[in-house]
């Protein structure tokens, strides 16, 4: 009888220990899996820690079904260079890693008055949104700058001068140019059927650097592939830093894929 009691006691003790051993094993496996999250991405992907996911290097490839690229909802937009909207994540996602942008070499002889973000390598500069938009890190997208104000863009008069039609067209153009303050260019607004235009300083305007982009002049600095932080210096685009996976060109005007 005594032997029987001892056997029963040992059996109960063994059953009590098993759950703890199993729990420890599961916990160990979970921790190991979590620590390898960034290593689970394929060679054609990179890890984006802000959303804890793998993203395709260079952005999503065009769908074989020709599905249109998702566009941000009203009130949101993505930086024009290196970012795209993702409906599933409801935010903007980068086309390349964002954690280690390549800074401008200290030997570069830029004459720009802009302060290069690479002067503080410990902090990564935020993505550059289009004019009138600000980057919100918590939302991973651009939102309208506040306070939001109606556009004060001057518009040419719709009332024709007396005389024939040819005279009106010449006068119409003549009035449009002087309407902008000295030093600004009157750039037609793309898609406008009313002849509207905006006054831009094309010597420093990122999206119309060196000329009005709406008429095919100048350069859109925000469209430089691989560029993280750019500027427009006296009508010429300057690249200050690049996304990870790119290096700055020797002349500081583009980013070269590694």
Curated annotation (Swiss-Prot):
May play a role during the beginning of fruiting. Residues 1-23 form the signal peptide. Pfam families: CPL1-like. The lineage of its organism: Eukaryota, Fungi, Dikarya, Basidiomycota, Agaricomycotina. It comes from the Eukaryota. It comes from Lentinula edodes. This is Protein priA. Keywords: Signal. Residues 102-128, 145-166 are annotated as: Disordered. Residues 102-122, 145-156 have a biased composition (Low complexity).
């Amino acid at each position: 009888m005594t032997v029987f009691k001892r056997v029963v006691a040992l059996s109960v003790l063994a059953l009590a220990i098993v759950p703890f051993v199993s729990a420890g094993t599961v916990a160990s496996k979970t921790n190991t899996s979590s620590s390898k999250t960034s290593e689970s991405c394929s060679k054609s992907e990179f890890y984006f820690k802000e959303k804890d996911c793998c993203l395709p290097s260079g952005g999503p490839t065009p769908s074989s079904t020709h599905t249109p690229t998702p566009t941000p909802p009203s009130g949101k937009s993505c930086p024009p260079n290196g970012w795209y909207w993702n409906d599933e994540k409801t935010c903007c996602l980068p086309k390349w890693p964002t954690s280690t942008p390549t800074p401008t070499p200290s030997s570069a002889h830029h004459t720009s008055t802009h302060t290069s973000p690479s002067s503080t390598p410990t902090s990564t500069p935020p993505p550059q949104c289009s004019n009138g938009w600000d980057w919100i890190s918590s939302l991973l997208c651009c939102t309208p700058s506040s306070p939001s104000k109606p556009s004060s863009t001057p518009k040419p008069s719709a009332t024709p001068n007396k005389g024939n039609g040819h005279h009106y067209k010449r006068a119409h153009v003549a009035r449009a140019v002087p309407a902008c303050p000295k030093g600004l260019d009157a750039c037609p607004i793309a898609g406008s059927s009313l002849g509207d235009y905006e006054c831009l300083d094309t010597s420093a305007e990122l999206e119309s650097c060196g000329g009005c982009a709406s008429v095919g002049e100048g350069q859109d600095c925000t469209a430089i592939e691989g560029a993280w932080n750019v500027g427009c210096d006296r009508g010429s685009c300057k690249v200050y830093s690049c996304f990870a996976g790119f290096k700055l060109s020797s002349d500081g005007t583009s980013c070269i894929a590694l």
